[in-house]
Amino acid sequence: VSDTARKPNHQKKVVTVLEPEDEYTHEPDEAENYNESMYLNAFDAAQEVGGWFRLGNRVNEGYAEMTVCVYLPGGRVGFDYGRPHIDTNDKMEAGGLSIEVVEPFKHLKVRYEGKVCLLDEPGQMADPRTAFKENPWVECEVDLDYRGVSPMYGGKPQYEDGTELEVEAEKSFAKAHYEQHCAVTGTIRVGEETIDMDGLGLRDKSWGPRYWQALSWYRWLPMTFSKDFAMMISIVGGKPGGMVLEGDEYHIIRDCNIESDWDEDTYQTAMRCSVTTDHDTYEVTGEVISLIPLRNRRQDPDGNELFTRITEAMTRFECRGEKGIGMSEYLDQIVDGTPVGPDVRGTRSHPRP
């Protein structure tokens, strides 16, 4: 037995590990809320169009979370969400959406064949039942190739001797997570409209127990300016994080601040970010182009209704005179009708679910 193995966990060194096989699915934990999810976004800055696609396998609960969101010209959004049945975690394919790893860390494919709800006013999705009922559904086809333009960021934290960190399933959001900026080519068709995509984006993957209520709030800003200048800025419960891509190297964000503007629904409309790495400092401004509000609800063991709001906005960014595009994704738990994020400023309470 090594000296490291004899040490109590609190004295062991934690390292982050990422292997090519992590791009594929894992053997699920026993936790009921085990989640293995892949998310990919793509944007064309010149056209100010794009979208994001997510599959979250919850095989121990018997379903996948499947989301397709396409940002169209003029602020319109094509959107679908479903919980298709799954009984295996062997692949990322459900509800018409598939994510294929062609070559780990280098090349992935995203395909979707199905329908999306076409929203002229995406804010209607605050009441999804009504929005899905009152807006038209149109055919949608997605065929995109993602090729990495950056190193990998993140992985699975574990002790240096290879033993796993203990994760409390009820309070977990993920036990492993990584991200990568990508170049994206292909097509997105919504109804009679076709987007020829030659743009940039970011992808991520997580696995491990997840409840959407495990985090009280976060602000997540993935953005791209070019193939060799991009960022992911995050504040999770007050803790700064993320990275800046300069050339072919990631520089870890050591500190950041995000100051946001809000509308009467307490949805973000713009933001100003200060970012510090070991090498440089950056000032970034963002302006929301199109936003759709989403939610997740569940009951805790005591029967209390828990309500999570996630506002998903295609956002134009500017830094050092360079124009870029990406997302501003803001997650808040809603308590007594109010988002809990300490930065939220607005006038309207949200009705209890």
Indicate where each model-derived feature is located:
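Structured soluble/peripheral alpha/beta segments that form catalytic or ligand/cofactor-binding pockets
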Residues: 2-353
